[in-house]
Amino acid sequence: MGHRIKTQNRGRGGPTYRAPSHQYKAELKHLGNDKVTVRGVIIDIEHDPARHTPIALVRLEGEGKKVYLLVTEGLGVGDQVAWGPEAEVKNGNTLPISKIPTGSYICNIEARPGDGGKFVRASGVQAIIIDKTVDRVGVKMPSGKMKWFSSRCLATVGVVAGGGRGEKPFVKAGKKFHKVKSQATYWPRVRGVAMNVIDHPFGGGGHQHTGRPKTVSRGTSPGRKVGSVAARRTGRRKR
């Protein structure tokens, strides 16, 4: 009887290969819009398994509702934050990008007005407002590229907290395990030639080479489609 290889199981999408999104705390979308201003106070700083950036629990003024906010560097418990056109231009506040001065650091930028924030949300990153026109704002992204946004898009003033996270080495495999466990990543990744023959077409044989050509056609059956799929060329390039 045939045996499903890991590539097939990944495509099936079982629990092993799915992100544990039921453990995630919040989507972290902007409140308010370019016409309504919402204010609140930070009551706690928490960790969210969905991301490497700390998140803040905010109690809104008036109604007492609690929401989560993406934390920028320098924010702490007891700080006031606001979303909307009447918000002050200060660290942690969110307002239309057209109202933020040129040269300011911003993060959590909306791709389209009202979508809640899509760009510049990873730990320690920031974008810079470079240019403005009547209805668009030019922003230098963390990649160095220039991107234009609608002047009605909301953005948060400041740099995302958690900078320098990638500089600390994992050191131990157990630390890496817990990091990967919160993502849709299968880890560790075992080489096909190191597997048993039942687990992979390149496995078995008591040797560490494929034992057969690595190239396979585009229409090959799923259990055999491993290696160089529909490759135009293999090996080193000729000079």
From Swiss-Prot:
InterPro entries: NA-bd_OB-fold, Rib_uL2_dom2, Ribosomal_uL2, Ribosomal_uL2_arc_euk, Ribosomal_uL2_C, Ribosomal_uL2_dom3, Ribosomal_uL2_RNA-bd_dom, Translation_prot_SH3-like_sf. It holds the Pfam family Ribosomal_L2_C. The keyword Ribosomal protein applies. Keywords: Ribonucleoprotein, Ribosomal protein, RNA-binding, rRNA-binding. Transmembrane segments: none annotated. One of its GO terms (molecular function) is rRNA binding. GO terms for biological process: cytoplasmic translation. Residues 1-20, 202-239 are annotated as: Disordered. SMART domains: Ribosomal_L2, Ribosomal_L2_C. The keyword Ribosomal protein applies. One of its GO terms (cellular component) is cytosolic large ribosomal subunit. Part of the 50S ribosomal subunit. Forms a bridge to the 30S subunit in the 70S ribosome. Belongs to the universal ribosomal protein uL2 family. One of the primary rRNA binding proteins. Required for association of the 30S and 50S subunits to form the 70S ribosome, for tRNA binding and peptide bond formation. It has been suggested to have peptidyltransferase activity; this is somewhat controversial. Makes several contacts with the 16S rRNA in the 70S ribosome. This is Large ribosomal subunit protein uL2. The gene is rpl2.
